[in-house]
Amino acid sequence: MKIVVTGGAGFLGSHLCGKLLEQGHEVICIDNLLTGSEKNIEEYKSNSNFKFLKQDVSHRFEIESEVDQIYHLASPASPNKNSLKSYHALPFGTMMVNSMGTWQMAEIALAKKAKLFFASTSEVYGDPLEHPQKEEYRGNVSTTGPRSIYDESKRFGETIVAAFVRSRDLDGRIIRIFNTYGPKMALDDGRVVIEFVTAGLAGKPFPVFGDGKQTRSFCYVSDMIDGIIAAMEKGEKGEIYNLGNPQEFTILELAQKIKKITGSVSEVEHVLELPEDDPVRRCPDISKAKKKLDWEPKVSLEEGLKKLVEYLR
């Protein structure tokens, strides 16, 4: 098949491109390199089935060839306020790619009679009052808080896809991605796993917000890519699927695991209270994905962390 991956030079997108090439597909990787990196896709450039197009999908453009599937992953995703690549630093670009970019990819999918995959996020649940979160849960969200740039633009992207499915018979599906980690993450991404691993390897303190008892789930990237492909191949038109690892850990537990794996002398440093809008608990209910997609994570947190540490050393 001929497959388009937007955001293909990013963390998840580059892994997805690699997996699709392994499966023998032709891949058109589209990225404006605002937050993605050509280094992430360098290994694919010698593959005759791989084509890279530097393009902002928020702006009008055309894909001349036929297309069977479109994976729309393009969007800044880093919450690191100190990074120039975060959604805080790129508020309007973030909102545009998840609104006009999603609209445009839906139009292209219709014109090409292609399936569309929209990569949404667990952030649409906000600071959830339901635990674990099912796809039917509508969230506890802020429309104007500091995280709303990302959260609300993804919610609107979901609305666009749902409207195209209902009104124009688009073959689209929506996936809500929970915390994912692994090789090719930017070192300044700001999400807790990469921040703790780099701190542990450098012998620096683990910066913990609040008391560290807030919980997260962590999915290794290879599991997530398998889930993404399963959602495209087996997911039903108009459906939403949670993808993530349902095992839950406190931030303090994560710090101790990383300290042990890195052999670090680092200690926890409680730096600030929880940031505004930061959820106390976040964990997916993946019952639907297990039943409908025949998918569930296989890589344990310990195994995944060891892989990431080995990659970074």
Feature-to-residue mapping (PLM):
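Amphipathic terminal alpha-helices
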Residues: 301-313
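A short C-terminal helix-loop "cap" of Rossmann-like NAD(P)-dependent dehydrogenase/epimerase domains
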Residues: 48, 135-142, 168-169, 196-208, ...
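PAPS/PAP-binding and catalytic site of the sulfotransferase fold
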Residues: 250-262, 304-305
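Active-site loop of classical SDR/Rossmann-like NAD(P)-dependent oxidoreductases
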Residues: 35-37, 251, 272-288
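Glycine/proline-rich active-site loop of Rossmann-fold NAD(P)-dependent oxidoreductases
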Residues: 129, 155, 170-171, 180-195, ...
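N-terminal Rossmann-like NAD(P)+-binding domain of SDR-like oxidoreductases, especially those catalyzing
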Residues: 1-180, 222, 307
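Amphipathic alpha-helical segment in the mid-to-C-terminal domain
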Residues: 149, 189, 221, 251, ...
